[in-house]
Amino acid sequence: MRCRIQYYLIAIFSLAFIFSCDKEEDPVDNETDGYHQYGTPVANIPENEELVMYEVNLRAFSSGGDLEGVQNRLDNIAELGVNIIWLMPIQANGGPINSPYAISDYYAVDEEYGTLENLRTFIAEAHSRNMLVILDWVANHTAWDHTWMADSSWYTQDLNGNIIHPSGTNWTDVADLNFDNENMANRMIDAMKYWVLEANADGYRCDAADYVPFEFWKRAIDSLRAIPNRE
């Protein structure tokens, strides 16, 4: 029986994201050339009406402020009847206010929280307690020191060619991404594929989803459905 992997977009709609992209002329970052499934995808996914979700702020949830600290309290979370853990952003972050929503590298665990191995172990331990793990995903914008800044065309610009923060917001610590740039959109989906395969994450809660074009989400869903053993 094929596994059902669902990716939840909180308060907007449910989406699924997996895609392998063309990397020609892309800015340099920590991306690998090929991904392999780590661990075993969860087969028994609860129905939407059965979900009991718990959001975890890694910095605040444990004294260590990291993945290991949260892992040590998984039994406490499970006792609440939780069957899905939503981790606030775990990717490397930057910017002047150290916000976890200012991503500087989509392919790296922030050193403050641990390593890829720590994340893999955390997810495996959650799965052993019948809890899924979804990652907060920040698709709309990045930190100003993100690796993608090597190509300014990946970002929204004003009439003078200056990269800008998201329009209509006071989020000046982040730069708005340009979803008209196909290379950027492809790389974004590729990064989401990385965590699903290399860490066995169960999905994503997508931040500021309504700022991102629906066409991007639709293309991402279609890409996911082509991946074997995940639907």
Residue positions per predicted region:
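Short catalytic-loop micro-motif centered on adjacent basic/acidic residues
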Residues: 134, 203-209
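Bacterial N-terminal signal peptides
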Residues: 9-18
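Bacterial N-terminal signal peptides that target proteins for export
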Residues: 1-9
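Outer-membrane beta-barrel proteins
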Residues: 207-213, 217
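Bacterial Sec-dependent N-terminal signal peptides
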Residues: 17-42
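Substrate-binding/active-site clefts of carbohydrate-active enzymes
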Residues: 35-68, 72-84, 89-199, 219-231
